[in-house]
Each structure stands twice: as structure tokens, then as C-alpha cells.
């Protein structure tokens, strides 16, 4: 179908954001050589009829418009297209879908795609956070108005409904005081305005620059509102030791202990008055934001400043250290309020919420210090997950934040995981997710480099704006968070336009590659902190104790070695050390082992490799867009092989450490060599492509590149070679126990996701027994594992009993009588194999447990 012109028929009551979306559609059509104008739906030629809410389209509808907010439908008959939205945002999404088709169409029909298309949101909140951490690198994008127009348009096009400009997140008070250098926007208020009645200023900052900063903030907020986006301003720091940071590049003058709270209160009210488009504020409410835990008076005053603005402003409180007193303070303001825990530590794992936190995250008997009495004391279980926030009758939102510890540089784009996040972000009454965008923390703590956000040293690889490398990433993430069943053409049209005949291989490669580092992050967790653990550019944790202490020693229990690094889900995964102990004890486990993880990683590596080989046969390989994708896919494939071999080597290493049996050395060395070879290949790829120093912080483990990590990885292999004999390792033969463990390791069979039939209610009544029945191929007594949806608690288990052709078990009413929902799974055996039901499926994107909601 060809188009001579297009008439866009807007309803009389169309909002500004709907008008903007219609204008954007017209602009895209004009670029494609097709004139457009506003007019009547009854006009001739091609008509895009825009229908709001309960309005009646002039064209009979073959579909029903969903009742959910932000839903939309597109359908057409001949040259007449109906864009039908439940509300303004739904209409924006419908019109931007048509604009997107017109922008990326490669055929005659510029609106080609799925018709009819009906979509409704899964995650209610779909937020993107952009962090200002470096004066050197971030002022460039902060002051670029066209960059903001394009960036915010991209977010609206991809179904995001919130943008968070995040300030003050670059340091953690007081732990980072010695590192404080670049403090631009760290304590944000005096960088933006003069607050009457307070003699507070940034000594080195001119009034002109301060005023420019505020005008830019106003501009960004207006542009977000124009596109129908909520504008969240995240203010992570409320104070630091202003007089005890001699290396800081800006000086905060005039703040005292006495006037801090009144100043912040007045500043918040003024800021919200000056920028009326702000819809919410995010606060870090534990000690790292500068306020000692338990100093509730400060927050009462600060939140009063929010309420004084005279309009609804969402008060979003970062989850770490959050207690019920803080929730009550927010509640008493009358403002909408939310808690935003971390999704999985400060990393990105698989989409499901971890079944259990690390042992180190359970509350200690005594808090580490008085000012950390919550985050390192009674509320420690909330440091890195949802804690006890998901009660049945909660009156606040729970919005998860995915931190950028896992993957910062390489392009990500797996539709499977993105759809999984769309489903799991609503877990047990949750409300959505905020993603710290690619390159978050770039140039942090004074490590900014001019032009550093582009990362490439090879000419011709950089995009105009740094975020444009990740266009596909934003697309897949936003659209599948919104609608996990979104049609494939919604991302393939982009790849077809940008990557030509390599499009399908780019899609496959990014899907395989996108699972690699989330899987590694979930299963290998030497540190929860993104300030220490960066699996993408990995600081090597050795198989035998040695190096690694500085990067990881503060955050994992000794011994500090690869096989003892905890997982981020101890309910479903065992470490190599735990696995070796089970083997030596002649026991088995229902949990996934490091060898299961290695097998998954090997499959992902093969998928990456095949996609690269196929893409190299295409004519489009010369395109920078294809090259950017394929080199990152190849690097991820190499990382998958590296970690697969490290996991395998760790199993042999842990048996060797426990027994000193000499025959264990060769298989250990074999896998260690393969790991080094995989990293050498990654280094070869990165050496001429990426800069030597990718800076995300001043410490060695937060900077560098794959090729600069190579010497430490090769050095470990040389150390391991010495285990062959001599020195303190004499020849030791295996006794019966050791030989049994070796034989069991060699004969190991993978844990599989179960195919058992489960019969259980989707909901329950508190105080009533909750019955679970299973049937299918079962070899021995299955076990029901269950827990409240509360990370402060540990899992319980009960053996299921035979009942007819299946097994049954009950979660007792005394246990269900709580304020929490339930989660559960079943472990069993089949033909000698451990079976988890439901377990993780082949896409690694599902929830490996069932959830029953309290009615």
C-alpha cells in the first residue's frame, strides 16, 4: 500500500501530549516524503482516526479496548486506521507506534505491522533513570536540548511512562569520603538555586551557571511532560561532610547541623514550585544519603517541604534501611508514597525475584554502628531485595530499581528476559521497575574523561549521542515491560532497517548474549556492591586463595576464592564449595550446581558464536550498526565460555582443596586453561575496539578493559600449574571417600525443570491450610518448599505423602495466618535426576516458584 497523504483526525478534547504525538507522527511522515494534516475522519485518502477512552470509532472495531490505564488498540480497514487509547498515555503509545512503523518501514506500506494490535501494560511503572555522576562527561548531555528531545521521544516511543533524572548517587556517605572529588550536583539544591533566608551557596559556581542549571531542569521537565512521561527527580544525597573533603572540586558553604533540615525543607518546596512538572521525588533514606538512620526529625521536616508544594508529589524512598517509621512519616504527609528496593543486589540477574537473600544479609544481633542501625542492623534484610515490604494490605507502591553493576558497556537486548521482567516486576502486588540505564556511573568519583561515554577507540563506531548505541536495548526493554506478549515485529522492524540482511542474526545473537551476564550475576556473587563487582569487565577471583581480597574480601566470607563466592539465590543454587562438600558426604541436592550453570553458559556461548558466524556472511556486516552489535555479542560469548570453565574448574578445585588428591589437578588445570583461552579471545576483540580505560570509578576493579584484565587472568593459570607436584603438594591418592566424590562428579546429571502437574489454588485465606497436590513421574518422596513472601524469613519444607496417583502436602493454617502472600516449589527425583517444579525453563525467564496471593 502506498500513501499520497495522511489525514490525522484528532478529537476536540485531545490533550497536549496527544497533540505532540500526532505532530511527531506528522514529522516522521514528512521525512518519508508523505504530507500529512489534521482533518476529519470522514475525509478521503488515508485517515488515522484518533479515538479516546469510551469514544466510539467511526469504523467498527474487530477488537475490544482493554480497560486498563495506558492500554491501546490499532486496527484498520483499507486506508482507514483507528488509533484507540484508553487514556492520554494510551493514545500517545498508539500514535507513536504508527510513527515508529513509519520511521523504520522497509517496504511500500509504511504502516506495515501487526493489525489489529491490542496492548495493555503489565508493569504499571516503567521508569528509566539517567545518572549525573561526572562533571567532565555529563555536562555535555545535560545542556544539550536536542539530545533531550530525541532521548525523551525515544522513551515515549518505547512505552516508558516515567523518566528519573538522578542526582547525588555517585558516592556513598560516609564510606566514600576519602574518594570525594567531583561533587557537581552531589548535594543538588545549591547547584540549582538560591534559597531565600539561607546563606547557602557553592563557592566556585557562578550565579549564571546555577541559573542555567535550573533552566535546563525546567526544560527537561517540560519536555518529559509534553510526551506524557512522569518526571521523577531523584535526590540521593542530603548532606555530606562539607568541611572535611579537601579534594572536592566545589565547596558548599553556609550549611550547618542546625540549618540543614530547614534548608532542605525550604529548598524542596521552592524546587517543586519552580518546576511544576515534577511528579515525584526519590530519596535515599539510609545513612549513605548523609542522614544517620533513626534521625526521623530530618525526614519529617523534609517531607513537610514536599507537601507544602500544594500538589500530589510521589515520595519514593529507596528500600535499603527503610523501616515502618519512615513509611509512616511519608504516609502522614498525605502524599502518595512508594518504596523502591533493589531488584537483585546492585546487579541485574534473571527476571525472577531471588528466592532467598545471602546469609550475610540477615540481621546481625548487634548493628555495625548507631548511624547504620537499620541498614546494617535490624533492617539489613532490605539491603538488596524486597524484604518485608510486600504485605497484603500495603498502601504504598513497590517499585524495583535495577542497578548497573552487571553490564554497563556492552549492548544488551534479550526479548525473553525483558518479557520476564515485565511479568515479574508485578510480583505479589508490586508496581513496576526502574532501570539504571546503560553506562550509569560512567566517570564516577572524578574519573570522567572528555568524550569517555562513547567507549570506542576505533573510528566510525560511535553514535551521535551516547545512548543511541543502546537504541535496541531501550526498545526491547520498554516494549516488553509494557506488554510481555508484544509481537516480534515491534523490534524486528528496527533491526531490519538498521542491520539489513543481518537483522535476524543480530536478534538471535543479542538474545543469547543478553542472558550471559545476568546468569553469571545471579549465580556468582562475590559482592552485592556495584562498587566492587563488575562481572562484565571481571576482576579475577582465583580458584585457589590468592588475589581478589581487595576487591571482594569485605563482602564475602573467607576463604576468598571463586568456589566459595555465594550465589544471590541460596534456595536454588549451591556454590562449588557446597557442592564439593555434598559430594564428599555422599549426598545429593535438589539445587542447581555450578555444572548446571556451566552447561547453560556453554549453550549461550554456542548461540553467540553461531550468530556471529552467520552475520559475517552478510553484506550488512560493513555497517557500523551491525559491527557494534556483533562485537558485543562475540565478547559476551567469550565471557560465557570463560565463566562456564571457571565454574567447572571450581568444582575440581574445591575437591582438591578438601582432599589434596593429586589426580584432581589435571581436570582443574584443563578447565582453567580453557577459561584463559576464552578470555584471550575476548581481549583480542576488545584491544583495537574499546579504550584501555573504561572508567566507572577510581579503584582498579572499576576501570580498565577486557584486554587490560588479561595479565591477572593469565597469572592465575601460572600459579595453578604449580599444583602439579613439589612444594607442599605431594602426591596423594584418593581414598574411598574422595574416589566416591570424583565418580559422582563425573557421573553427575543435570538438575531439570519439572514437568509435574501441580494442583493448588491461586489464592488462600489467612488461617486456612493451603493444600498442594502433584502428580507425574516421581521416583521418591517429593518435598514441598514454602515461605512467606518475606525475605526476612527462611524457607521451610515438608515431605509430601502419597495420595492416590500423586502426592499431597499442606502448608498449615498457623503459618498462612500472616500479613504475607505465599511462595512455594517442589523438589523430587526422576530416574536419578533432581527435578525442580517449576524450576527454570529453557529461556531462563520464568519464576522458578509458584505464588499464592492472600485473598
Model regions and ranges:
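Feature activates predominantly on carbohydrate-active enzymes
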Residues: 2-5, 13-24, 28, 65-259, ...
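Conserved, mostly hydrophobic/aromatic
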Residues: 29, 87, 155, 283, ...
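Short, well-ordered secondary-structure micro-motifs within conserved domains or adaptor modules
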Residues: 38-65
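Short, flexible loop/turn elements at secondary-structure junctions
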Residues: 87, 132-134, 169, 235-237, ...
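Catalytic-core regions of glycoside hydrolase
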Residues: 105-106, 161, 173-176, 181-182, ...
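Aromatic-lined, polymer-binding surfaces characteristic
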Residues: 236-261, 274-279, 286-296, 627-644, ...
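C-terminal non-catalytic alpha-helical accessory regions
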Residues: 437, 441-710, 716
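Glycan-association/targeting regions that enable binding to alpha-glucans and other polysaccharides
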Residues: 720-855
